[in-house]
Amino acid sequence: MVAITLPDGNVKEFDGATTVMEVAQSIGPGLAKATIAGRVDGKLVDASDPITQDASVEIVTAKDKDGVDIIRHSTAHLLGHAVKQLYPNVKMVIGPVIEDGFYYDIFSEKPFTPEDMAAIEKRMAELIKQNYDVIKKMTPREEAIKIFEERGEDYKLKLIADMPEEKELGLYHHQEYVDMCRGPHVPNTRFLKVFKLMKMSGAYWRGDAKNEQLQRIYGTAWADKKDLQAYIQRIEEAEKRDHRKIGKALNLFHMQEQSPGMVFWHPNGWTIYQVLEQYMRKVQKDNGYQEIKTPQIVDRSLWEKSGHWGNYATNMFTTSSESRDYAVKPMNCPCHVQVFNQGLKSYRELPIRLAEFGSCHRNEPSGSLHGLMRVRGFTQDDAHIFCTQAQIQEEVANFIKLTLDVYKDFGFDQIEMKLSTRPEKRVGTDESWDIAEKALADALDSSGLEWEYLPGEGAFYGPKIEFSLKDSLGRVWQCGTIQVDPNMPERLEAEFVNENNERETPIMLHRAILGSFERFLGMLIEHYAGWMPVWLAPQQVVVMNITDKQADACQNVASELQNAGLRAITDLRNEKIGFKIRERTLERIPYMLVLGDKEVESGQVNVRTREGENLGVMSVADFIELVQKAVAQKGRLTTKTDEE
């Protein structure tokens, strides 16, 4: 007798071993038809897996997130089935689930074309119509090896070799096609009707550019057609907002092959960058941070001492001079400890907050580089707080408040906060972890906002809080972080004199709000589709004449605006005013001032916005006040109050 406990507390008894599908059938035919997989004592299993002892069982359907992920994984296998039918000589590699979809890496002598992708998608749809069952077979290791040897699937054999402890492997049969997976998968292809292949790209076996190149086909799959349509609309909107396209259209930056992963900032883009830096400089100064600057290139001895040379060497750019090895810094922390170490500190001086707009370089794989979002050279709004254990909570609480306030200034009010706790492999005592985790949790509670735990996701030396922003397309971007670190100060011999006149190692809090300027700017460009709030716009105002007679007056108005601290330019070209307005609107300049004879005579300006609104005629002083109010508002969705 096997007793199955359902989520509502009801218990169903079966004479012997049963399955998730049989449990669903015992509840009702509608549920059985909708069953994709199940959870047995919390573990995801196939609907056909045997349940041999008493257990708690949940039915997984397409309405569950797990159900949608299983649909996506099974659609990746379906893609493999279609590809092998159309191109029998290719070799299948891996086909995992990713956010909103899946991909499959394939080795093929001949590159796939868009026509091939269309043919694959068509064949997948034909296979789905056959409504065949997906059969799972737990297969002895040697038999699985024989199956893939007979099929010439070299990469599957390499993957099996990576798992020497596995005596039995899960093989999923899509008719004649066989794939290997831990599962679970859908029981029938009728669950896979809502899918679309999205794009193709190159990849490398095991992600290493030294290995052979593979072809990656990306797809998406959903439980409902409406969800697929909404996703495609989001993708199309995201493509329109691609920061690389907008960056080119607005003349913000470019990148080129001679310097992969490094940004060439143009005047417009550099203006936004400088506004960002000046803003963060003021914010940090107002909150007790001291700005410093540390070297770009540092001897390997410091990186060895900090642990980076041993653990991070492949991601570091190195150089040699006069028989000494150096690294271009990939991060700022070891250098900040060197500044702290100059002169013995007293506990009365703590906390000490050291901030740097630190220029860092990391040797990221070339295939992973993506515009401003993934670069090799970047600047962090980096800071390190040296404090006592007792000061952690207050410092973290202040940082949370500051970070959320900064995000509001950029127009982000949907923030996710997550606390990553101790991993299995860690340094330090359980007591020190208890104190650090409680300090971070209490600081999060003091914010009055929702947050969640990420158990086991902390670094080996301490817990951390991550801040993620939701943009205008609903995408989530991880940006800010604050990390407790007692390890690096100890490795680099940082000390202060405590109240008992004894030497003690400080706690170091690594923190960043924006993350990297480059990535944050890429996010802003896509969030606003290039329509930057007035305070961030490279040019805030353009002053335009109707005829040559108003040229001098336009120059005078522009000078007055510039003297008031506004970023203003003139457009005195001998073109029709309608043409100039259209062109400057495409440049996303927030305000356009038009001067004709009437405006010159009255000493006023005619004000239009890039949204096409005519604000009418006003004095230059009134216009300056209008812009200054918009600048003070920043990107906030509501007006900033005195309390904020």
Swiss-Prot record:
Coiled coil: none
Cofactor(s) this protein requires: Zn(2+)
GO function term, MF aspect, one: metal ion binding
Reaction catalysis annotation: tRNA(Thr) + L-threonine + ATP = L-threonyl-tRNA(Thr) + AMP + diphosphate + H(+)
Origin: domain of life: Bacteria
Keywords of the record: Aminoacyl-tRNA synthetase, ATP-binding, Cytoplasm, Ligase, Metal-binding, Nucleotide-binding, Protein biosynthesis, RNA-binding, tRNA-binding, Zinc
Residues at which Zn(2+) binds: C333, H384, H510
InterPro entries given in the database record: aa-tRNA-synt_IIb, aa-tRNA-synth_II, aa-tRNA-synth_II/BPL/LPL, Anticodon-bd, Anticodon-bd_dom_sf, Beta-grasp_dom_sf, TGS, TGS-like
GO CC entries: cytosol
Residue stretches making up the TGS domain: 1-61
Subunit and partners: Homodimer.
Matching PANTHER family: THREONINE--TRNA LIGASE, CHLOROPLASTIC_MITOCHONDRIAL 2 (PTHR11451:SF44), THREONINE-TRNA LIGASE (PTHR11451)
Protein name: Threonine--tRNA ligase
Organism: Psychrobacter sp. (strain PRwf-1)
Organism phylogeny: Bacteria, Pseudomonadati, Pseudomonadota, Gammaproteobacteria, Moraxellales
